[in-house]
Amino acid sequence: MTEIKYRDSAARFAVSFCGHAGYAECGKDIVCAGISVLASELMLACEQAQRSGEITDYRCAEESGYVKLSFSYGEGSFMRRTVRLILACLRLLEKEYGSYLRVVAQSPIQSQSQSRYNEGENQKERMAL
């Protein structure tokens, strides 16, 4: 199964693609091919957006069966729309082939100050119980 985990906030996006779908053997797996096309499109869009200055802080790591990337972007940007389109396509694949891939939205990326604030609020809640 391929697991796709992503975090999205108003200014930052991060995603990881991990594993082989297992729909068919390597080279004949249409689910894995669909996921690979979408991951590749996202990486190409990131490279172009980085060159044009639309995104900043772009990072990408690739290994066999694993891709992780992250970047910062503006609210109304082309990359924001690209991310939403690719996530929608991944969700459609998941709907059809849910036994072979899973798309997981994780908590939005927070700044350190927001994270510390939330930790303090959680601690207050635990103390009140």
Question: Model regions: which residues?
Answer:
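N-terminal intrinsically disordered, cationic/polar leader segments
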Residues: 1-30, 43-108, 114-129
